[in-house]
UniProtKB/Swiss-Prot annotation:
Organism classification: Eukaryota, Metazoa, Chordata, Craniata, Vertebrata
Pfam families in UniProt: Cytochrom_B_C, Cytochrome_B
Primary localisation category: mitochondrion
Binding of heme b b562, residues: H83, H182
Cellular component GO terms, alphabetical: mitochondrial inner membrane; respiratory chain complex III
The keyword Lipid biosynthesis is annotated on this UniProt entry: no
Keywords, in A-Z order: Electron transport, Heme, Iron, Membrane, Metal-binding, Mitochondrion, Mitochondrion inner membrane, Respiratory chain, Transmembrane, Transmembrane helix, Transport, Ubiquinone
UniProt-annotated location(s): Mitochondrion inner membrane
Binding site for heme b b566: H97, H196
GO biological process, one term: mitochondrial electron transport, ubiquinol to cytochrome c
Cofactor or coenzyme needed: heme b
Protein name: Cytochrome b
């Protein structure tokens, strides 16, 4: 009798994706982040579901309902902080996952890569809308500033902003619709992640060497299941340390002040994971230019495959490209720091230089260095 695991229509899908899947024998811990993102997503959906049971999306009661969750609901405080810090863990895993893709040339699988970019945008949109829900000062003013950026679109901008707001300012209608979108988007992300996986399994995983590994495959289970479980345990350990020891470390104190349209906070800034993009936005004095730079700072990932000039896939054996890659990482950390600083000298010029360097590395230096490396190897 054949194994039910291999014949049952549903079990067969699970089997071919997580059990009998042929995987390269040499994929390192950098390949763990896909499964970690899955763990993050499930965790966020579950904690979010329990929060939604007690949250009210009305301007008069939203802030109070979050306080009520933390004070009166059984274990509400831990659910709330797991959800808030879970978002930070989600983005740490996302950035490392995308960084791995850039380093090892995983972008050479265009369908998987492009769906990954759509996923990145979807997660960013979800996180932004989630940050608005507690209806603190930073929630309100963050929503006002970011939605206002759409008014930079010529001709239809103002109408578009008022349409999104559902009125002439960020108000009750805005909060209600943001809650609706924040609830539905994670399920769309879940579906997209399944498609992401589907396309990945069409080609099989890349590996650190960048060389096809068809001749050297091992079954996913038990080798990579145990590895993913270890990674997941480590993720939960770090998350729980953050939640139980310093839950407000990554948050903004201003968000403990209820939203007040008559009082602007001295420094409006988004959560830490958006600061690099916020720094790029602020580094251009023109509103439309800033918005375009902001969008292109993420969308640039879509043209990375077109800029691949190297004869090798990954950067494992390309020391010059490696130097550029780590310069890019340092540049992004600099942008993250600048995004959280006030708009004054010397932060303005540092932000502008870091923004120029970010685009220069990806669009100019990387392709040129790759050609130089090809010539050095006489390829």
């Amino acid at each position: 009798m054949t194994n039910i695991r291999k014949t049952h229509p549903l079990a067969k899908i699970i089997n071919n994706s997580f059990i009998d899947l042929p995987a390269p024998s040499n994929i390192s811990a950098w390949w763990n982040f896909g499964s970690l993102l899955g763990v993050c997503l499930i965790l966020q959906i579950l904690t979010g579901l329990f929060l939604a049971m007690h949250y009210t999306s009305d301007t008069t009661t939203a802030f109070s309902s979050v306080t009520h969750i933390c004070r009166d609901v059984n274990y509400g405080w831990i659910i709330r902080y797991m959800h808030a810090n879970g978002a930070s863990m989600f983005f740490i895993c996302l950035f490392l996952h995308v960084g791995r893709g850039l380093y090892y040339g995983s972008y050479m699988y265009p369908e998987t890569w492009n769906i990954g970019i759509i996923l990145l945008f979807a997660v960013m949109a979800t996180a932004f809308m989630g940050y608005v829900l507690p209806w603190g000062q930073m929630s309100f003013w963050g929503a006002t500033v970011i939605t206002n950026l759409l008014s930079a679109i010529p001709y239809i901008g103002t109408n578009l902003v008022e349409w999104i707001w559902g009125g002439f300012s960020v108000d009750k209608a805005t909060l209600t619709r943001f809650f609706a979108f924040h609830f539905i988007l994670p399920f769309i992300i879940l579906a997209l992640a399944a498609v992401h996986l589907l396309f990945l399994h069409e080609t099989g995983s890349n590996n650190p060497s960048g060389i096809p590994s068809d001749s050297d495959k091992i079954p996913f289970h038990p080798y990579y299941t145990i590895k993913d479980i270890l990674g997941g345990l480590f993720l939960v350990l770090v998350l729980m340390m953050l939640v139980l020891f310093s839950p407000d470390l990554l948050g903004d104190p201003d968000n403990y002040i209820p939203a007040n349209p008559l009082n602007t906070p001295p420094h409006i800034k988004p959560e830490w994971y958006f600061l690099f993009a916020y720094a790029i936005l602020r580094s251009i004095p023109n509103k439309l230019g800033g918005v375009l730079a902001l969008i292109f700072s993420i969308l640039i990932l879509a043209i990375i495959p077109l800029l691949h000039t190297s004869k090798q896939r990954g950067m494992m054996f390309r020391p010059l490209s490696q130097c550029l890659f780590w310069l890019l990482v340092a540049d992004l950390l600099t942008l993250t720091w600048i995004g959280g600083q006030p708009v004054e000298h010397p932060f303005i010029i540092i932000g502008q230089l870091a923004s120029i360097l970010y685009f220069a590395i990806l669009l100019v230096f990387m392709p040129i260095i790759s050609i130089i490396e090809n010539n050095l190897l006489k390829w």
